[in-house]
A protein has these predicted regions:
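Short metal-coordination and nucleic-acid-contact micro-motifs, chiefly zinc-binding Cys/His arrays
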Residues: 1-5, 53-58, 88-92
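A boundary/linker detector
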Residues: 1-46, 133-161
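Short cysteine/histidine-rich zinc-coordinating motifs and their immediately flanking basic loops
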Residues: 1-7, 16-23, 71-79, 107-114
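Short Cys/His-centered divalent metal-binding micro-motifs
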Residues: 8-15, 68, 91-119
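Short Fe-S-cluster ligation motifs
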Residues: 31-38, 89-100, 121-143
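Short Cys/His-rich Zn2+-coordinating modules
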Residues: 40-49, 76-82
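Short cysteine-rich loop/turn motifs with clustered Cys
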Residues: 44-72, 96
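Histidine-centered nuclease catalytic patch
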Residues: 61-92
């Protein structure tokens, strides 16, 4: 199958193809230089967006507020305490930003009470238990980002399964 109409078009097509390949190669090289933290932040951003959308019609997990100006995706077990639970949906819930998540450092006593109601004793006990540390990689972070992008799209379309 012929892609171009003649020699002049072939030269132009060849140059454009080479430019596209060069741009793609540069992008691959730039991406390889980005640190792991770049990919983790991107994954966490979309994960948190998903959690806020998932819990949009629910009150703050800690204080029950429904009218906060800003909402966070608050972690019951902090990322600093256990990075393995950073993207675990049982560990992340909608939380009012200024009062509970910032001023009260997560309002953990009331967060735990809210979790007990929401996920039950068995899952809460699992969450509070020991978890094998996992090494985060760029590939895993990119996979997490893709996973939550897809879940967010499905949620917005109304596909909750």
């Amino acid at each position: 199958m012929q892609v171009v109409c003649g020699l002049d078009c072939a030269l132009i097509y060849s140059k454009e193809t080479a430019k596209k390949k060069e741009k793609k190669d540069i992008k691959i090289k730039k991406d390889a230089l980005k640190p792991l933290s770049y990919y983790v932040k991107k994954a966490e951003k979309i994960c948190n967006e998903y959690i806020r959308a998932r819990d949009a019609n629910l009150p703050c997990i800690s204080c029950g507020a429904i009218d906060a100006k800003k909402w966070d995706a608050g972690h019951y077990i902090s990322v600093g305490a256990n990075r393995t639970l950073r993207f675990n949906e049982l560990n992340i819930h909608k939380q009012c930003s200024f009062n509970c998540n910032v001023n009260l450092s997560g309002n953990l006593i009331n967060y735990r009470k809210g979790l007990l109601k929401k996920i039950g004793q068995e899952k809460l006990a699992w969450l509070e238990g020991w978890h094998e540390p996992e090494k985060m990689t760029k590939e895993k972070a990119m996979s997490v980002e893709k996973y939550y992008k897809e879940k967010l799209i499905d949620l917005k379309k109304g596909n909750h399964g």
